[in-house]
Regions:
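Active-site-proximal mixed secondary-structure blocks
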Residues: 1-127
C-alpha cells in the first residue's frame, strides 16, 4: 500500500488520534493511540506506540495485524472513552456501539474499522 504525498486523506493523518482496532485473545478491541505515526509514503508504513501490558498489544502479537481509523472531529467522545478503559475489563466495542458509533469489517484483515473516520488503514506486522 502506498500513501500518496499531498493527498487530502494523507493530510488528515498528520495530527489526529488513531483508533487502533484489533482481534485476538482479548476479542475485538479498540483503543485510542495518540502516538500513531506515518513513517513512509512508499511503501506505506505506520508505527504505533503501545504499552507492553495493554490488551491491544497482546492481540497484535497473536494476530500480527491491526486496523487504524484516523478519528474524525466528531469522534472525540469515542477517542476519550476507548482511550481511558482497558479491554481487559471493558468490552469497548460494545460501549462504542451503545454510544451510537458504528463499525464495518475490514476488507483484508479480521478487525473492525470505525465508520465515518477520516481515514482507514489495514495493517500487518512485519519483521
Amino acid at each position: 500500500m502506498d500513501l500518496a504525498f499531498g493527498d487530502e486523506k494523507t493530510k488528515t493523518f498528520i495530527t489526529n488520534v488513531g483508533l487502533v482496532t484489533t482481534n485476538g485473545p482479548y476479542g475485538y478491541n479498540i483503543m485510542a493511540c495518540e502516538w500513531t505515526h506515518h513513517i513512509s509514503y512508499s511503501p506505506g508504513l505506520v508505527a504505533i506506540c503501545l504499552q507492553s501490558e495493554c490488551a491491544t498489544l497482546a492481540n497484535i502479537r497473536e494476530s500480527k495485524e491491526f486496523g487504524i481509523s484516523i478519528a474524525a472531529k466528531e469522534q472525540s467522545i469515542l477517542s476519550s472513552v476507548v482511550g481511558n478503559n482497558s479491554a481487559k475489563t471493558v468490552d469497548k466495542i460494545k460501549v462504542a456501539k451503545a454510544l451510537g458509533f458504528t463499525f464495518t469489517k475490514a476488507k483484508k484483515i479480521d478487525v473492525y474499522m470505525v465508520s465515518q473516520s477520516a481515514l482507514h488503514i489495514e495493517c500487518k506486522v512485519f519483521k
